[in-house]
Every structure is written in structure tokens, then in C-alpha cells.
Amino acid sequence: MTIRDDHVLAADLAAEAGEMLLTLREKTGFADPSALRAEGDTASHLFLMEALATSRKGDSVLSEEATQQERLDPRRLTAERVWIVDPLDGTREFAEEGRDDWAVHVALWERGALTAGAVALPAGGRTLSTLDPPVLPAPRPGVRPRIAVSRTRPPGFVQDLARLVGADLVPIGSAGAKISAVLTGEVEAYVHAGGQYEWDSAAPVAVALASGAHASRIDGSPLTYNQSDPSLPDILVSLPGLAPMLLAGIRDLHR
């Protein structure tokens, strides 16, 4: 097994789970959104768990859909390799007809760092991964930066930050879709505070870092994964040249 194998596996599994979810979405329809969300979560989780158990038998897995007992398994904390997956990021958007801002996340953490990851955006027909990291868009001098925020619960402080730095807010669905939007040039930054978990950001952060983007907590400290408490409540991902201004603005707001 080579390092490249992990990049390939992450990309393949995310894309395959995404295709399965597209088929399920088309077959089931949108008449019962809650049932569609539950079925999608479960089907993708089972697929990823079985695939990783077959392909990477000795590795641990942390999944959003794992039971509390599985999440608390102490073997994960001493493992050298842990896959961190979100089988369906953006269940709300997945169950809304016409929306494409949902994703599948597959990331690998090794000995303290994210080493591989992929974000499938099935309804948009693309997968971003560390196998072939996207080239970051060029800066737009003199143009107001755009900050991706939650479409359902945008943090109040991000609205204050946008006013302070002269930015526009762009509502987007899932965390994976928002970070992907930074990497593809739809926005220049994503700022969030108020509650997330490791599986919400591990894969897109792996891709962002491989692309050369900035990714940190909103106080500038590193994002850390495979912790005993998987809560990771805030995040900043941006084009590298914009990060100092955003971090300074956040510090000013929190004085």
C-alpha cells in the first residue's frame, strides 16, 4: 500500500457513495424528506463502513452515523490511522429537490495530521480530493470578498465581521459545499462558529490544506482531529491572502 493508494481510496469511496445517494434520491423522491434523509444517511454510512473494513482492515473509523459507544471506543485514540467520514453532509439540502449543496466526506488522519481526503459533490458532478488538489483561484483586488455562511443558521458575529471588513455573505448548504466553494472560486472564505464536529470538516479541510488554502480555528489556532471529544465548534477557511484580515477582524470583534 502506498500513500497514493489512500488518496485514491478516499476519492473513489466518496464518489461511489455520492452516486449511490443520487440513485436513492431519484428512486425515492422528495415526498417524505425526513425518510429520505434517514435512508440516505444510513445507506451511505453502511457502504463506507463496509468498504473501509474491507480495504483498510486495521484502521479505525470515526463516522457521524456511528453509535455513541463506537465514538467512545478508546482504540480510536491510540490508533495510528483513523478514517473520519461524514456519509451525508447536508441532509437538509439532500432532501430538497433541486439543491446541489450537499456532500460526502472521506478523510484519513495519521499520527496527528490529515493526510488524505475527498469531498464528493454528487449533484454538481464533481469530487475534490487530495489526489489532485484544486488550484486556488487568483485574488480579486479591489473586489469585496465573499464569505460563505450557513443558509439556515448564519452566526451573528459573521454578519458583524462582514460589515467590519467590507465583505458580502453567501448562504450555502453543507459545510463541505461551503469549503469547496472557497477552493473553486465561488467565495473567498468560510467562517463558522456555534457547533460542528470533526466529520463536518476533516475531508474538506484536508483538501483545502493540500490546495494551499488557510484553515484554522477562528482564533488562528490549528484544527485538530481524532480527539476524545469530536466537537470542533468553529472554523475559518479562506484564500491565504485573506486570512490575516479576517483573523484580525475576528479578534477586534471579540475584544
Label the model's feature ranges.
Residues 17, 21, 52, 91, ...:
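Residue-level signal for inorganic ion chemistry
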Residues 67, 98, 120, 132-133, ...:
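Residue-level structural signal for beta-strand termini and adjacent loop
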Residues 141-255:
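An extended, acidic
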Residues 113, 134-138, 241-245:
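Short helix-loop capping/hinge motifs at secondary-structure junctions, enriched
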Residues 75-132:
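DPxDG-like acidic metal-binding loop motif
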Residues 53, 73-76, 119, 137-140, ...:
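Short secondary-structure boundary/capping segments
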Residues 1-88, 160, 255:
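N-terminal subdomain of lithium-sensitive/metallo-dependent phosphomonoesterases centered on the IMPase/IPPase/PAP
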